[in-house]
Amino acid sequence: MFKINNTFINGSFIQNNQKTYFDLINPSSEDIYGKLECTSIQNLEKAILSACNAEEECANLSIDNRKNILLQILDGIIERREELAEIITLEMGAPINLSKNAHIQMGIDHLKNTIKILDNYEFETFEDGYKVLRVPIGVTALITPWNWPLNQTLTKISSAIAAGCSIVIKPSEFCALSSKVLAEIINNSDMPRGGFNMVNGIGSELGPIISEHKMINMISFTGSTQVGINIQERAAKTVKRVSLELGGKSAHIICDDVDLNKAIPNAINQCFINSGQSCSAPTRLLVPEDKINEIKKIAINHVNTIKTGDPLSNETALGPVVNAKQFNNIQNHIKNAIDSSCELIVGGIDRPQNINKGFYVKPTIFANVPENHPIAQEEIFGPVLSIITYKDIENAISIANNSKYGLSSYITSNNPEVAEQISKKIKAGQTIINKIGRGAVPAPFGGFKMSGNGREHGVFGLEEYLEIKAII
């Protein structure tokens, strides 16, 4: 059994005087594989002070030095990618191929893209009679989730380093091993001593202190909408910048001109990737009402081909969800939908057949779901899809926008012009047209409405960590 200490301050892993531990549980077996030593409040204060003391040195790093640090981190990730993939599979149950080809690769791509941006980004521009400087915002607190652990941490860290900011990161306690490897990699880079600090423990204990702290200039948070609201309320006392990437209930509009035998399986796969544990997952599938019967048959047949099981097997497409809390929450959503007479066409409550342990959820689809039903409105964060019928495209757009969230949207159409016109009417931070996955990494990512504010990735992600200063 591992005992993990992830309290990394001023260039060293340090002990916590008051020992509090968090059990690390393998979601595929429910066995405890390790214990995380939680960061004490005293050491959290030390981490923030360390970042504050390193603020000026980080800000004064040349662009070449910032690029070199990012290149060193990139090399470290690539060198340890097999190890990291196995760790992510252990921590959150992601199928090993997904860990390698998505979890790790997306983080690598973000690093490469940020390095490329620094080749041409202008931190100083001359306007008509004045100069504009883009300067580091200062001490940044980065709070990252468990669902895409390495991708989310590298997205934020790469932008903060590129901007010249010092960092205190609080990764998810469920991802202690991958976080430790990342800290080791950054420690082997030329990052200024104290410029990168990590605290690890229960979010509800550390989060309020981070949110209210006077020495922290910015918080970048990815997680649930309710926690994001709590952070923003507490952060308002010090008027610090808060960038929030929160929940979603994304719609996927299937137009009536497509090959359903291709479009429906692709839509289901997109929804169920990472066991449905993605804030941008297209969990509402909007289809023409006159084709619903055909679509149901295709959906049932496809779900029955999805291999659920051991995440270390190359054959597995769907692993467990991350923990018992998530499993029970998803089961409750499914049960409530069944009890309220939603049309269950495949899946349902309990584990898949022949799986007796682990936090495995049956891939589940409901059809003819009323657009205002909780199963079509609440973020479930599991492999659960709601199929909703529409009368015409304007009706589809109305249904897509009938959500408190606005993170992402998807369109499948054989007519690019029609798809683009639809996309302009959808209230979401991004629209993905005829693609499996997010598409271009540099594209900005962030939400409308209760899906958050601010943007990550590419130039827009870098600029979240910069202040604008005019010299006249």
Report each predicted region and the residues it spans:
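Hydrophobic face of amphipathic alpha-helices that form TPR/SEL1-like repeat modules
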Residues: 1-28, 114
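Residue-level signal for inorganic ion chemistry
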Residues: 11, 30, 66, 88, ...
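A short acidic/small-residue loop/turn micro-motif
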Residues: 15-22, 38-42, 258
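Conserved C-terminal structural/oligomerization subdomain of aldehyde/semialdehyde dehydrogenase
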Residues: 29-35, 216, 307, 353, ...
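Short, well-ordered beta-strand elements within core beta-sheets of diverse protein domains
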Residues: 33-39, 54-60, 142, 252-255, ...
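Long amphipathic alpha-helix in the N-terminal Rossmann-like dinucleotide-binding domain
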Residues: 49, 67, 71-82, 94-120
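Rossmann-like NAD(P) dinucleotide-binding subdomain of oxidoreductase/dehydrogenase enzymes
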Residues: 123-262, 390
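ALDH superfamily catalytic-core signature
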Residues: 226-370, 433
